[in-house]
Amino acid sequence: MSTIEQTTTEVSTSGLSRRHFIQAAAATGIAIPFAQMIGGSSIGAAGKVFRYASQAQEGPAAPWMTKGGSLGILNAVGSWLIDVAPSGELKPSVATAWKGTNGGTTWTFTIRTDVKFHDGSALTADDVVYTVNSHLDPKNKSQSAAKLGGGVTCVKVDAKTVRFDLQKPNANFPYNVSSSNYGLLLMKNGVKGDESWIATMNGTGKWIMVSHKLNEKTVFKRNANYFDEAQIPSFETMEQIQYVSQSAAIPALKTGKLDSIHLLYGNEADTLPKTKFYKTLVPTCGGLHMHMRADIGQLTDKRVREAIALTLDRTAYIKGVLGGYALVANDSVMDSFPTADKSVPQRKKDIARAKALLAEAGVKNGFKLTLQSWKRDDIDKFTAFVKSSCKEIGIDVTVDLDGSDGGGARWYAYSVYPSVKGSKVANKGEWLASEFGIAEWAGRPVPDEYLNREWKSTGDWNPHYLDAPDLDAAVDAWLTALTPAKKKAASSLIQKASLKYTPIIVVYNETRVTVTSNKVKGVEFNQQGANWTSGTNA
C-alpha cells in the first residue's frame, strides 16, 4: 500500500461524516446524497413499492445545481466513481481501483466497461472526463466545482483509465470524486447538467426516474441492468415523498403510507412503538452551523462573537431538545474526527465571562441583532435556544426565518455566490449575505469540504467573511498533509484558530436517526443520509 493509500485508509475512512439535512424542512426527511436509496416495503403494490420521506427541495435536482432535498433524487438515478459506506470507507463503484502518485498530486482511476446509462448507451472514460470538466467550466456555475479543489485537471489515459492532476497534494482526493460530492454523478458526454437534465435524469444509477414533481413526489423504477448485480434493488418501484415537517411524516409512517423516515429527532423516534418500528443511529459531524460576519455589522469584534458562543449551554440543549442524540461540538468541524486534538479546552456556558467580553468590546449593555435562516423544525428550535441564551447578556435577538419551500425564495436564493473575500456584501437575508445566520450541513467522511469552502477566507461558501491568515494556513496544512501525524497537527491548529476567531458556532454534531417499519428489513443509511443497504420485505 502506498503512502497516499495508507493515509487515506488511516485518516479518511475512519472519519465521521456537508451540508443540507438533519431532518430538513422535511424534518423527518431523508437527505440521501449517495447512490443507493433502496429498501423494502410490504406496503402498496403487494410489497413491490418502497416509500420514504424526504426534505423539501431548495433547488432543482440537476448535477450542476443540486442543493438540499434534491440530493436524494440524484442519489437514486446516479452513480459515482467511488461510493462512501456507512463506516466512511471508500468502496469501488464505476471505478474499480484508484491510486495516488507523485506525492498525492496525481490520482489515477480504472473505470468499469460494463456501465450503461438509462438510455442504454455505454459509459466511457470520455463521459467521466466530460462530467468533471463540465463542473470545472466556470460558465456552468456548478455548485460542485469547488469540492474538487482548485487547479484540478482531468484527462483520459485510455479507454479504461482517467487521471486527475492536482496543483497541491491531497491524500483525501478520492472523496472529492465520490458519492459525497453528490453533484458529480456521471453524465453522458455533451449533456448539460442544468435544469434541462431533469426531464430525463439519464444517469447510471440503480433507479430510473419515472415522474418528478418538485417538492411533492418523485417515482422511480428499478434498473434491472444496473452494473453491480448484487446491488440491484429488490423492489420494483421507489417513491420519494417530500414533507414539510416530521409532524406530517410520522402519521404517514404509522398508517403505513411510508416505510421509512430518516433524520428524525431522537425523542420523536422514541415515541414510536418498538413492536412496529425499528430505529438505527449513525453518528456524524453534521448539524447546524451558525455564522457571524467578521467584516461588517455588529459582530466584527471577535470578543463579541466569543461572548455569544459562551451563552450557550450545549449539554443542556443536546439532552433537553435533542433527546441526547448528538455529541457536544467545540465550534470547529474537526471535533468528531479521530485526528482531533482532545487537549483543546471545550467551550462551555460562562455568562460572567461573556458579559466581560462585551464590556471589553464597548457594548456592555448589549444590542439588537437579527438571526436569519429558513424555517424547519430543527432550526426553529435552535433559534429559540440562541435567542433566550443571548438575552442573558443583553443581546436582543430577533429571529427572521424564510418560510418558503427549502428556503429557496430567499435564504438559499444564491443571488450572492460565490463568497468573495473582501467584498463586504450587504445583508440580504441570504446564507452568504447575512450578518448572523444558520445553515444546515450534512456530515462528511472527511472535513475537507467544510474547511476549503466554509472556513477558509477564499471559500466559495464562506458566510462569515473572516480574513485570518493563520486559520487559512492551518486549513492548507490539513489539506496537504500526507500522514496521520501531520493531519493531527493541522487539526490542532484549526481547532485553536476556530476558537480564537469564532467565525462559526457549532454546538453539536448530530446523530442521524432513522425509523423504519418492521415490515422492511436491511435498511441502513450512511453518514450523509444515503441508504446503503438493499433492503427487502421482512
Predicted regions and their residues:
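Surface-exposed binding/hinge segments that line
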Residues: 110, 144-188, 211-213
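Gly/Pro-rich hinge or "lid" segments in bacterial periplasmic/extracellular proteins
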Residues: 85-89, 178-233, 237, 245-247, ...
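Structural transition elements
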Residues: 327-360, 375-381
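Ligand-site clamp/hinge motif
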Residues: 195, 225-271, 396, 405
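N-terminal lobe/hinge region of extracytoplasmic solute-binding protein
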Residues: 53-102, 133, 202
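Extracytoplasmic/peripheral linker and loop segments enriched in polar/acidic and small residues
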Residues: 398-409, 422-427, 440-442, 448-518, ...
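N-terminal secretory signal peptides
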Residues: 1-16, 27-30
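Long beta-strand-rich cores associated with HINT superfamily self-processing modules
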Residues: 514-538
